UniProtKB/Swiss-Prot annotation:
Basic residues: compositionally biased ranges: 248-261
GO process terms (BP): formation of translation preinitiation complex; tRNA aminoacylation for protein translation
Organism: Schizosaccharomyces pombe (strain 972 / ATCC 24843)
Location, primary (coarse class): cytoplasm
InterPro entries: Arc1-like_N (IPR053836), Glutathione-S-Trfase_C_sf (IPR036282), NA-bd_OB-fold (IPR012340), tRNA-bd_dom (IPR002547), Tyrosine-tRNA_ligase_regulator (IPR051270)
SUPFAM superfamilies, per the entry: GST C-terminal domain-like, Nucleic acid-binding proteins
Subcellular location: Cytoplasm
Protein name: tRNA-aminoacylation cofactor arc1
Known function: Binds to tRNA and functions as a cofactor for the methionyl-tRNA synthetase (MetRS) and glutamyl-tRNA synthetase (GluRS). Forms a complex with MetRS and GluRS and increases their affinity for cognate tRNAs due to the presence of a tRNA binding domain in its middle and C-terminal part.
Domain tRNA-binding, residue spans: 278-382
Subunit structure, interactors included: Component of a yeast aminoacyl-tRNA synthase (aaRS) complex formed by methionyl-tRNA synthase, glutamyl-tRNA synthase and the tRNA aminoacylation cofactor arc1 in a stoichiometric complex. Interacts with rar1/mes1 and gus1.
GO molecular function, one term: tRNA binding
Length: 450
């Protein structure tokens, strides 16, 4: 494989594949090597940088020192450059941090190089925010890589200095950074270097509205008389016989107008009543779990990356299933998600949906509600008798819609899941694709769904 780095873009080229990566503002020089040798210590010993590589030791030593603390190994800076030294040491001690596939290796090399480059930190953060729209980690699906560690150390002080408003605009980076900084091994390494935790709030900042000053009614009364009052006072002061006749006539005309107005006026309309909660208000969708890991701060929670058909990419979802479902069963599978609950922070990780499960009456068994086999990712689900209505964009917690409807969700004797009311069970199916079949529990009969 040959790495050809140009001033405008980087091309990673090898037989039958071509990748064009992010823009670079500096030049690098690499030896020609094969993909089979990309992990070998000999490759990293040969990896060299041109004179365009930065020589400011303060920035570089921070990344190297942090990763040394994380791996609990010594990484000396050599004449070949920091990335060469780093990759050589990691390949000997923790090769799994350098990627499994060819593409992962290339991504890790690219982002690690950026972390040690003279590119402005703000530019790296903006590129990373775009890159992380559809990823939990920088390169490896399975977890942290050396690129995550290097970039974390590079942008740490920048993220710590962001305001809440600035952080919300970079929500992909901040979500990733918050997840990385709460990993136990990362926290230990950071504490040893006095790197503080960044205070990250992924909620939208409140809009400051100017306060409205109400005028005092007394001031209004004590002010000058209005023009209308002046006219009335003039009308109440008729002069002579002619003035008295005019006053009488005016009073009669006003009375007639008032009578007509009273007849035209209708009874005031009653304010519209709040809609009764119905199951169609909830946005059930087919989701696909790309990967799941254990929550860094909660032993009972998984953190999953789930594709729900959103244009913005996958969602991060926390679920309390550690006690009931093994981690290996949380990977690469279709599930049903509730997609319009208000996002909530669960031990510093924002959860953007909920996995829909069936539980036995005694809560000893909790299992996924299974979607129809041929349902597609992002398909909406609906209930019989409610399939003509659209779900709410987001459920208002104050209206308690979920709390009102959820007790009616159940699995029947035949394991088919639905919403049960006085008229019977309304079965759950893919909207517009009822022929695919109904959603079912795996083993739980007459269970609760939530």
């Amino acid at each position: 494989m040959s790495f050809l780095w140009a001033k405008e873009f980087c091309v990673l080229k090898y037989p039958y594949k071509l990748f064009i990566t992010h823009k670079f503002s500096y030049l690098l020089r690499f030896e020609t090597v094969t993909l089979n040798n990309i992990r070998s210590p000999q490759f990293y010993a040969k990896l060299t940088f041109s004179h365009h590589q930065p020589t400011v030791s303060g920035t570089m030593s921070t990344e190297l020192k942090f990763i040394s603390k994380y791996l609990q190994i010594s990484i000396p800076e050599t004449k070949e450059g920091p990335v060469s030294s780093l990759f050589k040491a990691v390949s000997e001690q923790k090769p799994e941090l350098l990627g499994n596939t060819d593409f992962e290796k290339a991504q890790i090399l690219e982002w690690t190089t950026k972390a040690f480059s003279p590119i402005e930190t703000q530019s790296i953060v903006e590129q990373l925010d775009e890159f992380l729209k559809s990823s939990t980690f920088i390169a490896q699906d399975s977890g942290i890589s050396v690129a995550d560690l290097a970039v974390y150390a590079r942008i740490h002080s920048y993220i710590c200095g962001l305001s809440a408003k600035e952080g919300y605009k970079l929500n992909n980076v901040c979500r990733w950074f918050d997840f990385i900084q709460h990993q136990e091994s990362v926290m230990e390494a950071a504490n040893s270097m006095s790197m503080k935790l960044a205070n990250i709030d992924l909620n939208a900042p409140k809009i400051q509205r100017p306060s409205v000053i109400k005028k005092d009614k007394k001031e209004k009364k004590e002010g000058k008389p209005s023009q209308e009052a002046s006219v009335k006072s003039v009308e109440k002061a008729p002069k002579g016989l002619e003035g008295a006749k005019k006053e009488k006539q005016n009073k009669k005309e006003k009375k007639d107008k008032k009578d007509k107005k009273d007849k035209k006026e209708k009874a005031p309309k009653e304010p519209p009543k709040a809609a009764t909660p119905v199951p169609s208000m909830i946005d059930f969708r087919i989701g696909f779990i790309e990967k799941a890991v254990k929550h860094p701060n909660a032993d009972s929670l998984y953190v999953s990356t789930i594709h729900c058909g959103d244009a913005e990419g996958p969602r991060t979802v926390c679920s309390g299933l550690v006690k009931y479902i093994p981690l290996e069963q949380m990977q690469q599978r279709k599930v049903i998600v509730v997609a319009n609950l208000k996002p909530v922070n669960m031990r510093s990780v924002k959860s953007q949906a909920m996995v829909f499960c069936a539980s036995s009456p005694d809560k000893s068994v909790v299992e996924f509600v299974l979607p129809p086999e041929n349902a597609e990712i992002g398909d909406r689900l609906t209930f019989e008798g409610f399939d003509t209505e659209e779900p709410e964009a987001q459920l208002n917690p104050k209206r308690k819609i979920w709390e009102a409807i959820q007790p009616g969700f159940t699995s029947g004797e035949d394991l088919i899941c639905g919403y049960k009311d006085e008229s019977g069970l309304h079965r759950l199916f893919v909207k517009g694709k009822k022929d695919l079949g109904f959603c079912k529990a795996q083993t739980v009969v007459n269970g609760t769904l939530s």
